[in-house]
């Protein structure tokens, strides 16, 4: 039929299939059906995997039916040209592989920022960047506390070796201040009145917090030292008053005991003297010594009389 009318689809041969530009398909199953325009129909099915050549053969003239074999117009419509496939496919594959490698190689961290009253979620590939992206206004107090703690640690490490001498110096200063206050306390009131230049004075400014205490020589003292001196003076006064009261009570007790003992001795003497006066005959004597002598002589005479009567 194609031969009579001069048009139609020629029978395609297997040799022409190898010349097709199918490099973009690779190894695939091919189902090809070829029809002729005559009464007889040549149908064949080819299933299998064929290595498609990447080189397109030149079209050639076949004497059978007078057709030029090559890539037909329909093949060009259904199959894209070779150059485009060779250029586009590798680029697309490379891009996909590069993206997959980047996604697999990257590690992302979830960082929860709970500083302050807010909670924020940060997603970053680097943990350092996530901390750098924290809000500056959310944790200024934390940074200040960390800086202060670092400074305190540095100061403490530096003071470990020199802590004892500093304490000794402080104790010496306190002792010196206490001794100076004791010496000033023992001064008499007349000396304080006459020496007006050396007397301590208190200067009070407009604010209560800015009070300064001037010492005996006009040297300003801090509020802490002033409080220490005041407390020490009060304690010394209390001690002196307590000691004075104790001494006074002891002295008064001794005096009373002495007086009582003296009174008791005098009373006993007066009682004995009165008894002797009543015993001794004769005139009443005023001097107690004479009364005692007369009483002794009288007792001796009575003893002699008693012996004579027994004899």
From Swiss-Prot:
Write out the entry's keywords from A to Z: DNA-binding, Nucleus, Transcription, Transcription regulation
Organism domain of life: Eukaryota
| Signal sequence bounds | none
The record's GO CC annotations read: nucleus
BP term (GO), one:
regulation of DNA-templated transcription
Q: Which GO terms describe its molecular function?
A: DNA binding; DNA-binding transcription factor activity; protein dimerization activity
> Could you tell me which residue ranges the bHLH domain spans?
253-302
InterPro entries with a match to the protein in the record: bHLH_dom (IPR011598), SAC51-like (IPR037546)
Chief subcellular location: nucleus
Q: Where in the cell is it found?
A: Nucleus
Quaternary structure, per UniProt, is: Homodimer.
The protein in question is named: Transcription factor bHLH145
Q: Which gene encodes it?
A: BHLH145
């Amino acid at each position: 039929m194609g031969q009579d009318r001069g048009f139609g689809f020629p029978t395609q041969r297997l040799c022409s299939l190898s010349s097709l530009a199918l490099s973009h398909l690779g190894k695939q199953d091919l189902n090809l059906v070829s029809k002729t325009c005559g009464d007889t129909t040549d149908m064949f099915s080819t299933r299998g995997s064929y290595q498609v050549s990447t080189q397109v053969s030149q079209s050639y003239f076949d004497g059978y039916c007078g057709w030029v074999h090559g890539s037909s117009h329909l093949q060009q419509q259904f199959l894209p040209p070779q150059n485009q496939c060779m250029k586009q496919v590798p680029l697309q594959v490379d891009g996909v592989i590069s993206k997959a490698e980047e996604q697999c190689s990257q590690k992302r961290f979830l960082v929860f920022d709970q500083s302050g009253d807010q909670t924020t979620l940060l997603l970053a590939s680097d943990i350092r960047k996530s901390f750098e992206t924290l809000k500056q206004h959310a944790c200024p107090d934390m940074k200040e506390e960390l800086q202060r703690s670092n400074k305190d640690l540095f100061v403490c490490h530096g003071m470990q070796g020199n802590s004892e001498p500093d304490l000794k110096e402080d104790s010496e200063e306190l002792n010196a201040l206490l001794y100076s206050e004791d010496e000033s306390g023992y001064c008499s009131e007349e000396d304080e009145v006459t020496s007006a230049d050396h007397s301590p004075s208190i200067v009070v400014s407009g604010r209560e917090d800015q009070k300064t205490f001037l010492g005996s020589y006009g040297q300003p003292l801090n509020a802490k030292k002033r409080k220490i001196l005041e407390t020490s003076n009060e304690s010394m006064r209390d001690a002196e008053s307590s000691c004075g009261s104790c001494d006074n009570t002891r002295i008064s007790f001794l005096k009373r005991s002495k007086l009582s003992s003296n009174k008791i001795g005098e009373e006993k003497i007066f009682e004995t003297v009165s008894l002797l006066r009543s015993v001794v005959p004769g005139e009443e004597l005023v001097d107690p010594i004479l009364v005692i002598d007369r009483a002794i002589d009288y007792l001796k005479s009575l003893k002699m009389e008693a012996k004579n009567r027994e004899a």
